[in-house]
């Protein structure tokens, strides 16, 4: 009886882990289309104000620098 309960709990636990770790492919498709659209909208005129990667930034300094960590711009599209 104890072994059966332990097996049931183990199966439920492993099932929950699988559900938590599963990818949601619908989100990936939505974000890839958004990135493609944003890439098409960015022209040379809009890229002039962007900071290069690893340059100094502030929190509200540049709209192109999405991650300003320790005053460094880490991601610049």
Swiss-Prot record:
Keywords of this entry: Disulfide bond, Knottin, Neurotoxin, Secreted, Signal, Toxin
A GO-annotated cellular component: extracellular region
Cellular compartment(s): Secreted
Protein's UniProt keywords contain Cell membrane: no
Signal peptide interval: 1-22
Pfam families registered for this protein in UniProt: Conotoxin
Domain of life: Eukaryota
Claim: Amino-acid biosynthesis is one of the keywords in the record: no
InterPro entries per UniProt: Conotoxin
Distribution of this protein across tissues and organs: Expressed by the venom duct.
Membrane-traversing stretches: none
Broad class of where this protein is predominantly found: secreted
Cystine crosslinks: 50-65, 57-68, 64-73
Proregion span(s): 23-44
GO molecular function: ion channel inhibitor activity; toxin activity
Family according to the record: Belongs to the conotoxin O1 superfamily.
Domain comment in the entry: The presence of a 'disulfide through disulfide knot' structurally defines this protein as a knottin. The cysteine framework is VI/VII (C-C-CC-C-C).
Protein name per Swiss-Prot or TrEMBL: Conotoxin ArMKLT2-0122
Species of provenance: Conus arenatus
């Amino acid at each position: 009886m104890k072994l059966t309960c332990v097996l049931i709990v183990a199966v439920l636990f492993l099932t929950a882990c699988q559900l938590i770790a599963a990818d949601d492919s619908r989100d990936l498709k939505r974000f890839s289309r958004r990135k493609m659209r944003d890439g098409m909208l960015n022209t040379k005129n809009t890229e002039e104000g962007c900071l290069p990667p690893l340059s100094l930034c502030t929190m509200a300094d540049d709209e192109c620098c999405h991650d300003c960590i320790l005053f460094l711009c880490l991601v610049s599209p």
